[in-house]
């Protein structure tokens, strides 16, 4: 990240101003701060969801962003359909998603809800599905923006283990919390 600025409105409110840092492969970096200080904006900029108003962001490798609850999901589609939609958005090959479909559903604990539209899911169910899809493939960079807080304790522990396994495999982690 080099001299990144992100203007939110034309009234000169800068969510990010002159932010510069480097993260090495395999590092785990936490961004901590008050609400509204720019943490989520920074992660969205790194993930390519937002573009900086000024400055540059250079990312080497594949990114699995877990930024907003339900991002990349169509609420009218079923969990099954959303696995392929969200996987395509993340750049995962359809063949790989087919091969690992059961693993995604099993990790998300949604076997009985595969053919239910996501609009009927609780926030925890949506989080489980999103995390399971994003982490079925070991990315170079995993971005997690506070969304795991909505999952239950047992699922949070499963996520922590999977993230730990990814870190041990060399994945870089960017994590936001308060």
What are these regions (language model features)?
Residues 47:
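Helix-to-loop junction immediately C-terminal to a conserved catalytic motif
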């Amino acid at each position: 990240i080099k001299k990144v600025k992100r203007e939110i409105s034309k009234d000169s409110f800068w969510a990010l101003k002159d932010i510069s840092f480097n993260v090495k492969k395999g590092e785990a970096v936490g961004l901590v701060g008050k609400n509204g200080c720019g943490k989520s904006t920074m992660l969205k900029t790194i993930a390519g969801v937002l573009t900086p108003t000024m400055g540059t962001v250079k990312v080497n490798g594949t990114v699995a962003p877990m930024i907003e609850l339900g991002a990349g999901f169509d609420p009218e589609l079923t969990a099954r359909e959303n696995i392929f939609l969200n996987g395509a958005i993340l750049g995962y090959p359809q063949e790989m998603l087919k091969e690992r479909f059961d693993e995604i559903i099993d990790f998300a604990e949604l076997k009985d809800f595969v053919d239910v539209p996501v609009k009927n899911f609780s926030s925890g169910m949506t989080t489980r599905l999103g995390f399971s899809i994003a982490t079925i493939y070991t990315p170079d960079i995993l971005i997690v923006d506070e969304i795991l807080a909505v999952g239950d304790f047992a699922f949070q522990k499963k996520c922590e283990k999977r993230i730990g396994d990814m870190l041990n495999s060399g994945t870089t982690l960017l994590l936001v919390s308060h």
